[in-house]
C-alpha cells in the first residue's frame, strides 16, 4: 500500500522535531510548509529537509529577507508575521490541495485555529473550528471549562486597566491574570492583593507588547482574569519533591477523549515549569480523578480529532481544577519520553487518527507496565540566584561554565543527555524566566522519588561560574 501524505505546518512547539519527523516519515509522506522561516532553527530545518518529500517556505517573507539564515537556537519567534488569519488559511489550503494531502497537522500553538479552518474546508479531520478557537483563546476556554461539570472559577475578560480594576474588585485575590493568546505560561501573573496591582498590570501589559505573535492570532480580549486555583500536593503525594499540578497527554478521536500518560511535575519558578517526570507515581484513585477532569475539559471544548496537552491543578481533598488544555502535543521532551518509557509513538498515532479516525489502532486506557522513569529538567537563573551564585542586582550575565556535582544524584538516577551553555553565553536577566533556560537535562532512574530528589539536589547544588568582568547590574 502506498503511503498517504500529511501536510505539516512546521513551526515552534509541541512534539520536538528530533522525534516527530522520523516517527511520521516512517509511515507517511511528509510535505512541510514553513509559514515563518525565522521560527525554524538550523537543526529543525535539517530534519525537515531530511524527512520531507517537499518543503515549501512562505515566499512573501523572502521578499524582505533575501539573505535569511535559520538561527542556531530559538525559544520564541521574535519577528513579525503580518498575514491575516484568512490569508494563512488560504496558504494552508493551497499547499494541501497541490500535494493532495490526506491530513494536516502542526505542533505550534499559534496556528491551531487557522489550521482547523483549513482542515474543515478541505474536508479533512481536525480539531474542529469552534473547538480550536476555544482551545486557543483562554477566555473562551475558561467559559467552556466552567460549563463542563468540573470546579467553576470566577473569570472576566480584560483589555484595559479599567477592565482589570473591575475584575480584581469582582473576583478578589489571589487572582491570576493570563494572556489569552500565548503559550508556555508567558506573561501569566499572580496578584496576591490589590496593593500595587495597577502598576503590576501595566508592567505586564507593557512587557507583552514586546512579544510578537502572528497577525493571524485572534482573540476577544488580550487577558483573562481568574480566581487562582490553590494547590495542595500533600493531599495527593506521599513524598516531597512534586508540584501541585500534573499534565495529561492524550488524543481526541471523533470527539472521544483518550488519555495516554499523566506527567508529574516539580515545583515551578513562578509559572515557569522546571521538570516533567514520565509517568506519574500517583495512586489509581488519583489517576481516575485526574482522567475524568481531563475528559470533561477536552470533550467540553468540543474537540474532534487532535492531540491534547491538559494541565490540572491538584487541590485540597483531592479536588481538581482545570488550568488549561491545548489542542496539540506537549512541548519539551514529554512525547519522546512517552515513547522511551512505554514504546508508544504518539506522533505516529496522531497522524493515524487524522487519516483513519476510529479505525486507527489506539490504547484504550492509561499506558502501564513501565520499569523506569524519565525526567526533563531545566535550570534557570533563579536557581542560581537562590544559591547565591548570580548577584541579585545583575541584569546581564556572561557564563564561563556550569557544573553539577556527582553527589547530587540519588539511587540509580543518571543523566541520559545534557545541554550546557558554552563559554561566553550571555543571558539577559530582564527576559521572562522561561526564555532563559541555562541547562537542560534528561534523567533516568528506576525510582520516581529518587529522580525527583536528584532534581531537587541539582537545583540547589549546581554551580555556575560567571565571567565577572562581564556581569552587568
What are these regions (language model features)?
Residues 2, 289-310, 316, 326-393:
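Active-site "cap" helix and flanking loop/linker of ATP-utilizing ligase/carboxylase catalytic domains
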Residues 121-187, 210-212:
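A conserved helix-loop-beta module that forms one wall/lid of the active-site cleft
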Residues 158, 188-193, 251-253:
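Short beta-strand-to-turn element immediately C-terminal to the catalytic PLP-Schiff-base lysine
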Residues 352-473:
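Peripheral (often C-terminal) accessory segments that flank ATP-dependent C-N-forming ligase machineries
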Amino acid at each position: 500500500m502506498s503511503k498517504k501524505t500529511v501536510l505539516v505546518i512546521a513551526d515552534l512547539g509541541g512534539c520536538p522535531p528530533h522525534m516527530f519527523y522520523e516517527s511520521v516519515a516512517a509511515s507517511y509522506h511528509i510535505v512541510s510548509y514553513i509559514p515563518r522561516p525565522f521560527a525554524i532553527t538550523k537543526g529543525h530545518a535539517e530534519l525537515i529537509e531530511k524527512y520531507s518529500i517537499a518543503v515549501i517556505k512562505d515566499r512573501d517573507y523572502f521578499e524582505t529577507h533575501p539573505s535569511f539564515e535559520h538561527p542556531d537556537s530559538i525559544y520564541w519567534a521574535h519577528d513579525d508575521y503580518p498575514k491575516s488569519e484568512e490569508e494563512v488559511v488560504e496558504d494552508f489550503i493551497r499547499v494541501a490541495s497541490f500535494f493532495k494531502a490526506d491530513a494536516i497537522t502542526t505542533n505550534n500553538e499559534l496556528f491551531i485555529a487557522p489550521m482547523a479552518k483549513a482542515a474543515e474546508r478541505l474536508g479533512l479531520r481536525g480539531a474542529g473550528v469552534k473547538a480550536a478557537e476555544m482551545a486557543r483563546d483562554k477566555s473562551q476556554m475558561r467559559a467552556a471549562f466552567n460549563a463542563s461539570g468540573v470546579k467553576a472559577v470566577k473569570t472576566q475578560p480584560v483589555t484595559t486597566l479599567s477592565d482589570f480594576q473591575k475584575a480584581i474588585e469582582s473576583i478578589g485575590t489571589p487572582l491570576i491574570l493570563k494572556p489569552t493568546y500565548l503559550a508556555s505560561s508567558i506573561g501569566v501573573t499572580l496578584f496576591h492583593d490589590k496593593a500595587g496591582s495597577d502598576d503590576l498590570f501595566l508592567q505586564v501589559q507593557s512587557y507583552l507588547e514586546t512579544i510578537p505573535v502572528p497577525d493571524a492570532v485572534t482573540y476577544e480580549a488580550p487577558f483573562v482574569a481568574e480566581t487562582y486555583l490553590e494547590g495542595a500536593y500533600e493531599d495527593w503525594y506521599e513524598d516531597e519533591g512534586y508540584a501541585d499540578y500534573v499534565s495529561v497527554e492524550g488524543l481526541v478521536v471523533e470527539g472521544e477523549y483518550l488519555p495516554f500518560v499523566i506527567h508529574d511535575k516539580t515545583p515551578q519558578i513562578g509559572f515557569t515549569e522546571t521538570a516533567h517526570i514520565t509517568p506519574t507515581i500517583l495512586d489509581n484513585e488519583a489517576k481516575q480523578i485526574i482522567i475524568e477532569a481531563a475528559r470533561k475539559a477536552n470533550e467540553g471544548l468540543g474537540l474532534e480529532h487532535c492531540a491534547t496537552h491538559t494541565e490540572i491543578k491538584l487541590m485540597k481533598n483531592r479536588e481538581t481544577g482545570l488550568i488549561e488544555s491545548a489542542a496539540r502535543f506537549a512541548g519539551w521532551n514529554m512525547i519522546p519520553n512517552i515513547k522511551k518509557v512505554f514504546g508508544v509513538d504518539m506522533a505516529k498515532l496522531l497522524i493515524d487518527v487524522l487519516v483513519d479516525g476510529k479505525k486507527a489502532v489506539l490504547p484504550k486506557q492509561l499506558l502501564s507496565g513501565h520499569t523506569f522513569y524519565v525526567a526533563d529538567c531545566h535550570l534557570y537563573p533563579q536557581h542560581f540566584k537562590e544559591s547565591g551564585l548570580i548577584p541579585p542586582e545583575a541584569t546581564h550575565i556572561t557564563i564561563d561554565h556550569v557544573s553539577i556535582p556527582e553527589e547530587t544524584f540519588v539511587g540509580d538516577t543518571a543523566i541520559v543527555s545534557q545541554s550546557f551553555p558554552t563559554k561566553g553565553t550571555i543571558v539577559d536577566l530582564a527576559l521572562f524566566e522561561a526564555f532563559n533556560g541555562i541547562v537542560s537535562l534528561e534523567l533516568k532512574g528506576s525510582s520516581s522519588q529518587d529522580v525527583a530528589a536528584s532534581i531537587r539536589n541539582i537545583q540547589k547544588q549546581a554551580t555556575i561560574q560567571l565571567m565577572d568582568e562581564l556581569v552587568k547590574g
